[in-house]
Design a protein with these regions (language model features):
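Flavin-dependent oxidoreductase catalytic core characteristic
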Residues: 2-25, 54, 62-63
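Glycine-rich flavin
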Residues: 24-122
Length: 122
């Protein structure tokens, strides 16, 4: 079954594709792998992803996010998969953000969700 993206989702996918082709080609993954990067990802690339708003896609707007949904996030991951892009986006922007949004206390949401959006925690 083909997924039909709306205009905003398609735009996000196109931006992700262009950004990742330019900044994170497969050779970039190999460099990180071969240098045995302790983090397992490029900190500058992660900061750029945060600046594009990717870390806040699933975070509700009231906490500084975009509440854009799983389809939007999925379109980014599709492009990341094509480039073998290592990043903390899944662990932080999907798992962390979703768990806190769905099961966190108000205090936890107020404390952690803005930090996920601004990239200060991973």
């Amino acid at each position: 079954m083909a997924l039909i993206l709306n205009e905003e989702q398609q735009s996000l996918k196109d931006i992700a594709k262009e950004f990742l082709q330019k900044n994170a080609p497969v050779t970039h993954f190999r460099e990180i792998r071969d240098t045995e990067n302790e983090l397992g990802y490029d900190e500058k690339l992660w900061k750029d992803m945060v600046d594009l708003g990717w870390s806040g896609i699933l975070v509700p707007e009231e906490y500084g996010g975009f509440d854009f949904g799983m389809v939007g996030m999925g379109s980014i991951f599709e492009e990341m998969g094509k480039m073998l892009t290592p990043s903390p986006l899944f662990a932080t922007g999907v798992l962390g953000a979703s768990l806190i949004t769905l099961g966190g206390s108000n205090s936890q949401k107020q404390n952690y969700l803005p930090q996920i959006v601004d990239g200060s925690i991973t």
